């Protein structure tokens, strides 16, 4: 699915634009998606992921190997 983080699963949300006169129109809040390459030492190769900034922080915290195990278990990669 497009515009979805491969690590966290975050996608677009729906909300309203609210003007000064309190008029409301529908809008979408898009996730902050970035394409990033990660060097996987155990596999001796680069892995390219489409992730949000929150997913990037999660990779910094857990490590790329732990994230890849989760992705493979879900069938993402």
From Swiss-Prot:
One Gene Ontology MF term: structural constituent of ribosome
Gene Ontology CC: one annotated term: cytosolic large ribosomal subunit
Entry-linked InterPro entries: Ribosomal_bL28, Ribosomal_bL28/bL31-like_sf, Ribosomal_bL28_bact-type, Ribosomal_bL28_sf
Keywords: Ribonucleoprotein, Ribosomal protein
Matches recorded under SUPFAM superfamilies: L28p-like
GO biological process: translation
One Pfam family it belongs to: Ribosomal_L28
Taxonomy, superkingdom: Bacteria
Family: Belongs to the bacterial ribosomal protein bL28 family.
Entries under PANTHER family matching the protein: 39S RIBOSOMAL PROTEIN L28, MITOCHONDRIAL, LARGE RIBOSOMAL SUBUNIT PROTEIN BL28M
The name this protein goes by in its record: Large ribosomal subunit protein bL28
Gene name as annotated: rpmB
């Amino acid at each position: 699915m497009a515009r979805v983080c491969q690590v966290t699963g975050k996608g677009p949300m729906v909300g309203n634009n609210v003007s000064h006169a309190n008029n409301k129109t529908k809008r979408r809040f898009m996730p902050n998606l970035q394409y990033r390459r990660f060097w996987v030492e155990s596999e001796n190769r680069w892995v390219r992921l489409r992730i949000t900034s929150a997913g990037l922080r999660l990779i910094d915290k857990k490590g790329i190997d732990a994230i890849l195990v989760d992705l493979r278990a879900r069938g993402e990669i």
